[in-house]
């Protein structure tokens, strides 16, 4: 299993360090890998890895709130507290993202997904409700971490 883990990490870091396309979901998943490896003080995490992770986060972060209703990753998709090592990289977009969230919470007190399934069916409506719950819990945890709400 260790060898498989190293192979996966090597593949992820090869993409991270390259100039190949590395989209928002790829970057978010690699960021989660880097975060976990940092927690165990892995020698796989080098300054070059951290620098490339910063580059990918910035490449995939939208700072224009006019686009937030579209399918874009915001600063708070990559940073969930001010203790994140990537906080300084995106901090200039944090408050505007909070403002957007508060301006766009719906009458039920939850947030709608910024995407659609392209169909209207019982299943798509149920999945949409599930996503509302996921988004709301995730955002509530972030708001709590930034002392923007009280529990």
Ranges and model annotations:
Residues 1-151:
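Preference for long, amphipathic alpha-helical scaffolds in soluble/luminal domains
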């Amino acid at each position: 299993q260790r060898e498989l883990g190293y192979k996966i990490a090597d593949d992820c870091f090869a993409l991270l360090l390259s100039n190949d396309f590395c989209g928002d979901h790829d970057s978010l998943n690699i960021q989660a890998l880097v975060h976990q490896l940092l927690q165990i003080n892995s020698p796989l995490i080098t300054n070059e890895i951290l620098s490339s992770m910063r580059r990918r986060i910035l490449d995939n972060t939208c700072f224009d709130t006019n686009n937030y209703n579209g399918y874009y990753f915001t600063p708070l998709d990559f940073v969930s507290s001010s203790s994140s090592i990537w906080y300084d990289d995106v901090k200039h977009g944090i408050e505007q993202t909070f403002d957007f969230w508060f301006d766009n919470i719906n009458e039920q007190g939850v947030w709608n997904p910024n995407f659609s399934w392209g169909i209207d069916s019982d299943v798509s409506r149920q999945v949409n409700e599930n996503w509302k719950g996921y988004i709301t819990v995730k955002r509530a945890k972030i708001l709590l971490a930034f002392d923007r709400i009280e529990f």
